């Protein structure tokens, strides 16, 4: 099972539409939801962004930050759908995930047990605690 983390805490995963692997993305303009690996080039999705409802980006390790870059690039390319980080994202990384463009984080039950909801909620005020805002005073 998976737990979805948002700014309001833990929630069950209610997404029931499934995901298509990036390599199997249909060539037509059918609305879809895509699983993107951490080594993907998001530029390959540029002509399909309006057809994609949700993109779920894999984090194979908490030390692998490529997913943050992919999310940021997708937002800069104009993706307005839902972005979900999936995998080994830690509570300490939640603010960075939100700042880079993610709407939510999907973690497994084991990680949710090791890092309970209160640890994630402590990072939920991600807009108020960013480095550039502190520099501006």
List PLM regions with ranges:
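C-terminal helical cap(s) of enzyme catalytic domains, especially alpha/beta-barrels
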Residues: 114-137
């Amino acid at each position: 099972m998976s737990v979805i983390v948002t700014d309001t805490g833990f929630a069950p995963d209610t997404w029931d539409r499934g995901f298509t692997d990036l390599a199997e993305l249909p060539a037509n303009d059918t609305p879809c939801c895509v699983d993107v690996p951490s080594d993907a080039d998001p530029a390959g999705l540029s002509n399909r962004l309006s057809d994609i409802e949700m993109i779920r980006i894999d984090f194979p390790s908490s030390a692998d930050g490529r997913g943050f870059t992919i999310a940021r690039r997708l937002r800069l390319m104009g993706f307005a759908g839902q972005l979900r980080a999936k995998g080994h994202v830690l509570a300490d990384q939640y603010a960075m995930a939100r700042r880079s463009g993610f709407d939510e984080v999907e973690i497994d039950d084991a990680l949710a047990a090791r890092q309970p909801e209160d640890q994630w909620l402590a990072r939920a005020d991600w807009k108020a605690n960013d480095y550039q805002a502190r520099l501006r005073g």
